Design a protein with these regions (language model features):
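Feature detects amphipathic, helix-rich regulatory segments
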Residues: 1-167
Length: 167
């Protein structure tokens, strides 16, 4: 991997879309997401085929996550679809390393705007290298998750043993 990385605006890498109200929709199989994650399922999708990155517009603005299509997002959550050949996992890694709270545009409830997201300056390589880097970090995140589960299980076992040691 020796290609030159270019400084670009995040808005050049993604399309930023707004969530919408879901209350007029019937129950179904399409997951609805808000800033806190999964909420319920409805009958229609805002994004049928394109996976995206969810980022809070209001409330929790510093916890991006990947949305697998099809999905619906509420109006407090933007969904960002990588443009052209930009890699979803690579762009997600960028999102995870941005100090979103420092871009809060409110005096009350934390808020982000499409403009604030679009203007963020990032370094990005060509799409082939993005794909390799994105896949590497996806696998790394998976390993972290597996080890975290194991750690949680061991902590629960320790707690159980300590509670029952003197019974």
């Amino acid at each position: 991997m020796t290609t030159v990385w270019e400084q670009r605006k995040l808005g050049d890498l993604i399309d930023i879309c707004s969530g919408r109200d879901y209350k007029h929709l019937e129950d179904g199989d399409i997951p609805v997401y808000g800033t806190g994650g999964y909420m319920l399922s409805v009958s229609e999708a805002l994004s049928e085929n394109d996976d995206a990155i969810g980022i809070g517009r209001k409330g929790t603005i510093d916890k991006p996550y990947i949305l697998k299509a099809p999905f619906w997002t509420v109006d407090t959550l933007f969904y960002c679809i990588p443009r052209d050949c930009n890699d979803l996992n690579f762009v997600f890694d960028i999102f995870q390393n941005i100090s979103w709270k420092s871009m809060d545009e409110s005096t009350g409830v934390p808020s982000l705007s499409k403009t604030a997201i679009s203007k963020v300056e990032v370094l990005a390589p060509k799409s082939e290298e993005q794909g390799k880097i994105g896949q590497y970090f996806k696998e790394f995140d998976h390993l972290i998750t597996l080890h975290q589960r194991k750690c949680d299980e061991l902590q629960n076992l320790k707690k159980f043993m300590l509670q029952n040691m003197f019974v």
